[in-house]
């Protein structure tokens, strides 16, 4: 479950980076 949360954060960060 903890890994899932980390993955979600990474995905969110990646999305922001892609948008930028």
From Swiss-Prot:
Source taxon at top rank: Bacteria
Pfam families: Tet_res_leader
Keyword Disulfide bond among UniProt keywords: no
Keywords, in A-Z order: Antibiotic resistance, Leader peptide
Region (Disordered): 1-20
Biological processes per GO annotation: response to antibiotic
Official protein name in the record: Tetracycline resistance leader peptide
Classification lineage: Bacteria, Bacillati, Bacillota, Bacilli, Bacillales
């Amino acid at each position: 479950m903890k890994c899932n949360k980390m993955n979600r954060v990474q995905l969110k960060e990646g999305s922001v980076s892609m948008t930028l």
